[in-house]
């Protein structure tokens, strides 16, 4: 009996040690994927290929890292809303250009696309602290421009970009008009158990029931669930119910946490939407949803109408 217990303890200990080793060695490769398999770090195309009006922007983050971005304009003199688009964790901003091309047309806006450090033409290596500084540098750049209306800046983040955008929005309540989150996770701590199921017993976010004894090993927790309730600006939550990477329940949890503190929250589901293609499968309804949200809450586009925190208001 004693030998059986010892063997069990050794087995559990071995699993914990193996999990710790995997987490330390590979976590950054799971969270940040600047180069897709079979491709290079460089941009396969630029906005000119799609006949878009754009500017190469070079920035310095507060720690001196050189960053690259594209500022894409609807028209040379367009002073309408500017959307700061923060991408997912894999690939680079060039892989989002087709979606952005349609975004410009449907929403009649400008789009600022930042390459996180370590992505695309930006220097450095990605980390939560570093990317948070990168996003702030991008916003500071926009606020200094004289060719846009700085009262109409909207943050749009998908997946990892949602975590980046939520942090930026919370930290800049007077500069950002609204936030749009699409298929975003509650935290990397919660996603650890999704990617590696055995980790859910030892790693988890603030709402998890596990022991959380290995949370200290996670270098980029991106705990959006812990800050979403502090955001005062209007928030639109877009959830693809066929998301194969981030369980849709994460978006519902984020909405519930935000709506408990913010009456200007909206939750919209797209039954056919997967992690990366909700904008495509959602069709015209997807773009109408965002357009309506912007008309309600972005300076210069506001229409008369009552605000609502109910998911039913836009989820028809």
Range-by-range predicted roles:
Residues 60-141, 163:
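Membrane-embedded segments
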Residues 141-147, 151-195:
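Primarily recognizes the serine-hydrolase "nucleophile elbow" in alpha/beta-hydrolase
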Residues 230-232, 237-239, 243:
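Short beta-strand/loop motif that positions the catalytic acidic residue
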């Amino acid at each position: 009996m004693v030998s059986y217990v010892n063997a069990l303890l050794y087995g559990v200990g071995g699993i914990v040690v193996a999990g710790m080793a995997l987490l330390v060695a590979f976590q950054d490769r799971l969270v940040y994927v600047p180069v897709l398999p079979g491709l290079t770090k460089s941009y396969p195309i630029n906005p000119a290929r799609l006949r878009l009006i754009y500017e190469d922007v070079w920035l310095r983050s507060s720690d001196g890292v050189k960053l690259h971005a594209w500022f894409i304009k609807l028209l040379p003199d367009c002073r309408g809303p500017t959307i700061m688009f923060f991408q997912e964790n894999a690939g680079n901003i060039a892989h989002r250009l087709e979606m952005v091309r349609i975004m410009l047309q449907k929403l009649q806006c400008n789009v600022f696309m930042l390459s996180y450090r370590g992505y695309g033409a930006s220097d450095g290596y990605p980390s939560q602290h570093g990317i948070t500084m990168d996003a702030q540098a991008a916003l500071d750049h926009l606020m200094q421009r004289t060719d846009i209306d700085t009262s109409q800046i909207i943050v749009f983040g998908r997946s990892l970009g949602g975590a980046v955008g939520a942090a930026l929005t919370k930290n800049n309540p007077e500069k950002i008009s609204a936030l749009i989150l699409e298929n975003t996770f509650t935290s990397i701590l919660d996603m650890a158990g999704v990617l590696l199921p055995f980790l859910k017993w030892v790693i988890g976010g603030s709402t998890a029931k596990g022991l959380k004894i290995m949370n200290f090993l996670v270098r980029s927790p991106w705990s959006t669930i812990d800050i979403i309730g502090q955001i005062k600006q209007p928030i639109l939550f877009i959830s693809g119910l066929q998301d194969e990477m981030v369980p849709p329940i994460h978006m519902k949890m984020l909405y519930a946490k935000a709506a408990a503190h913010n009456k200007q929250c909206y939750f919209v589901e797209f039954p056919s939407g997967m992690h990366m293609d909700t904008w495509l499968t959602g069709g015209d309804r997807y773009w109408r949803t965002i357009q309506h949200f912007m008309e309600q809450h972005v300076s210069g586009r506001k229409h008369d109408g009552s605000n609502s925190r109910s998911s039913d208001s836009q989820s028809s």
